[in-house]
């Protein structure tokens, strides 16, 4: 018999399984029973209770996991940060392991931007939007501008901002991957196709060009793990379930959100000189007071967006909540002013939420499958 707690951290164990179960039950809780639409028709109390159960017993109460002291530690390639306290399970990558870079993370190769003197022509995919950058704006109380964040573009000299912005998005006027040898600017030097796709780059999936962890060549790779499930996601899943249950534990849900926000507040090790050097104004504070279910849910949804930005969660959250069409069509209309590729973009409600079942599978089912709305 193999002891699960004796397995190497690269293998998923009971906590990872519990987190996957919790996420599955959370999605399952939002019933979309109308075959002709993806509207949320009801919420399953039973499934929401399961989310609370699995996040507590198998993860939080079991111990051994928690939030990293600094948000950025989750996105560093150095071995001492891999499989850390926040990583419930991560896809494992390595270098200098006796292979011809066969175990490196090549999946982020197309994300590397045009770094002058390093890549000179990176593919620069997976671009953060202006809308996302604006979402990190905060008010004088250190709280997000829930309804007005996109009324104006973020101004680094006058706006308050959540520190996670500078650990998530590379922006003109700031060092790329915290290396002052590579100051980003709003030019074709740093952006693909003359800025057609905007001038922002993701920091979470990239590494320091001068460090030991960027494999250079025709393609670019690194040994940085890709975290599939992390503890902050677990906290926010649990908070969402508690809010939706609305059984008197909204204060507990807010405290979980505040755990994530308080960690963000202290996540300034890599950007400690940004306020003095670049004039930015960090301001993030926990929530105080009491909140209605509707207000708490709004806070939760916004927190998921900024905490998990560029980690491939946002679209699926919007589909789960039945909000994809409303949010994305508004996004396209507003973002087109900054990024012209969105000029004719649209999201078709009750179709684009899901991909259709492949034709081969439909044919092999002998009529037992019913095609979903993705093929409408």
Q: Which positions does each model-derived feature cover?
A:
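Glycine/tryptophan-enriched, flexible segments
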Residues: 131, 137, 141-144
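Acidic/polar-rich alpha-helix caps and helix-coil junctions
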Residues: 1-106, 141-376
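Short, cationic low-complexity segments
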Residues: 108-135, 188-195
